[in-house]
Amino acid sequence: MIRKRLIIVAGGTGGHIFPGLAIANNMITQGWDVRWLGTKNRIEADLVPKHGITTYFLSIYGYGLHGKKQKILAIVSILQAVLQSYYIMRKWRPDIVLGMGGYISGPCGLAAWMCKIPLVIHEQNRVTGLTNYYLSKFAKKVLQAFPSVFPNANVVGNPIRKEILAVIEPSLRLCNRTGPIRILVIGGSQGSKIINQILPVVAAQLAGKYVFWHQVGKGALKEVQQVYTSMLKNQLNYKLVEFIDDIAIAYAWADVVICRSGALTISEIAAVGLPAIFVPFMHKDRHQYWNALPLEQLGAAKILEQPNFTAEKVSQILMSWDRSKLFTMAQRARTIAMVDSTERVTSELIELANNTKH
């Protein structure tokens, strides 16, 4: 029997890559041959091959470069990426191409259309990205994590890694927990400057009553460590790391999360059941704000946009949440979790492949 073939296109940030990996691993268990298109200078270059997935790296720059020369280079690199991905698809002939959003999906989606290979796109945010907006015009299927982003698109959630889904539910994890309240701080895989600046002050204000596990981002450890040391002196109520390798362990440890509100982060926090303070990344479409809003409306989280993100406000919010309140918030977060998202996406891909004539 000839194995069905899938190319997944995802790169740049964990929010695109980790859902893609969840889908890839699930499709492999279904007997599919899966390959990956990404970029060689971002985290997928290290992460994806570790899963045993054949990975092709495209030479491409983002759309948002400034300056005439940089914009010309970006256009040239996009055209080059179209040709590279076209060649790969013509040679390997996948049954489906799945784009997970981000700028790399643009040229690869165009190449799939040129090769007459069915294209499926997945929109992770509550506000559609520019690339997916254009790709939706000729994609065979449009999948979305949240309702109402695209009219008539199927809602499938954001695929989540199995180890995160395996975290014990709040009723067993949190109900009898005692001791200092545990604060998990995540600025994304690349870190967040404002979170790194504010949290040492918060840790100093709350010393003795709270403990902190802070992911500072690549290259920021030494600088942030110096700030914590100067603020907390001999206090040992914090742990700093550049990157948390096993985020499921961190989620299971935490009572509260302070983080950005990327779509995948929102989905993971809901699936685990964790209260949160969200600090949306400032973008003109405010997509991270809209991602976080349903959890705030449920009473499961608090949103502090960057102009309002101060040590005083963070400390005030944390001190107003006792363990009983945190347990209630955690249970509320779980009510909007879509824990079968990976299976939903897998089902959509298999259905399309079975209904496509070659």
From Swiss-Prot:
Q: Which InterPro entries match?
A: GlcNAc_MurG, Glyco_trans_28_C, GlycoTrans_28_N
Q: How does it sit in the membrane?
A: Peripheral membrane protein
Q: Which CDD domains match?
A: GT28_MurG
Q: Is-annotated flag, keyword Translocase? A: no
UniProt superkingdom: Bacteria
Set out the biological process GO terms recorded for this chain's protein.
Answer: carbohydrate metabolic process; cell division; cell wall organization; lipid glycosylation; peptidoglycan biosynthetic process; regulation of cell shape
Question: Hey, which pathway is this one from?
Answer: Cell wall biogenesis; peptidoglycan biosynthesis
- Please give the catalytic activity noted in the UniProt record: di-trans,octa-cis-undecaprenyl diphospho-N-acetyl-alpha-D-muramoyl-L-alanyl-D-glutamyl-meso-2,6-diaminopimeloyl-D-alanyl-D-alanine + UDP-N-acetyl-alpha-D-glucosamine = di-trans,octa-cis-undecaprenyl diphospho-[N-acetyl-alpha-D-glucosaminyl-(1->4)]-N-acetyl-alpha-D-muramoyl-L-alanyl-D-glutamyl-meso-2,6-diaminopimeloyl-D-alanyl-D-alanine + UDP + H(+)
Keyword annotations for this protein, in alphabetical order, are: Cell cycle, Cell division, Cell membrane, Cell shape, Cell wall biogenesis/degradation, Glycosyltransferase, Membrane, Peptidoglycan synthesis, Transferase
Chain positions recorded as UDP-N-acetyl-alpha-D-glucosamine binding sites: T13, G14, G15, N125, R161, S189, I244, Q288
For this UniProt entry, the molecular function terms from Gene Ontology, in alphabetical order, are: UDP-N-acetyl-D-glucosamine:N-acetylmuramoyl-L-alanyl-D-glutamyl-meso-2,6-diaminopimelyl-D-alanyl-D-alanine-diphosphoundecaprenol 4-beta-N-acetylglucosaminlytransferase activity; undecaprenyldiphospho-muramoylpentapeptide beta-N-acetylglucosaminyltransferase activity
EC number(s)? 2.4.1.227
* Subcellular location(s) per record: Cell membrane
Q: Which GO terms describe its cellular component?
A: plasma membrane
Q: What does this protein do?
A: Cell wall formation. Catalyzes the transfer of a GlcNAc subunit on undecaprenyl-pyrophosphoryl-MurNAc-pentapeptide (lipid intermediate I) to form undecaprenyl-pyrophosphoryl-MurNAc-(pentapeptide)GlcNAc (lipid intermediate II).
Please report which protein family the annotation says this sequence is part of: Belongs to the glycosyltransferase 28 family. MurG subfamily.
Query: Which HAMAP family does the protein's record reference?
Result: MurG
The protein's name in its UniProt record: UDP-N-acetylglucosamine--N-acetylmuramyl-(pentapeptide) pyrophosphoryl-undecaprenol N-acetylglucosamine transferase
Name its species. Baumannia cicadellinicola subsp. Homalodisca coagulata
> Which gene carries the instructions for this protein?
murG
